[in-house]
Amino acid sequence: MGNIHSVTKSLESLGEEIILIKNFNDSNLCKAIILPGVGSFDPAMNNLTNKDLINDLKNWIKSGKSFLGICLGLQLLFESSDEGKVQGLGILKGKIQKIPNIVNQRIPHMGWCQLLPTKKNTLFGIEELNNWVYFVHSYHAIPDDLNIIAAAIIFKSSGIA
């Protein structure tokens, strides 16, 4: 799950200690877990299964401990994805769908977009409306409960969560 190097470098620049978890026993030393990801849904879920990390990861998240899923790491939290046949972690109810084709809009969507918070959360306040982030993605989350959306972007004329 590919952007580990980028995430590691970002956290190191903030002075954070990094522990790469290969066995969940290592998580006892962690104050938070980040599940990064670049790649495809099914191989990523198979990787978590083969490393016997799924139940421990679910328990960590359900306990309320700090967790951040980035890109594919977020997608894996959902029940399913248009990209594959393997079930996701199912922590978030809903699915991952391919971004619909929109005239004059290239998929994968690549570029800077303004992140629009929909409510206060632990990552940013609702008043922080000038957060620009870089995207490279072809899929977006469709949660069953729209109230879990913390931020969205405007992609052409439709909002993408």
Describe each region flagged by the PLM.
Residues 1-16:
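N-terminal beta1-alpha1 ligand-phosphate binding loop
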Residues 6, 80-81, 138:
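Short linear Ser/Thr-Pro motifs
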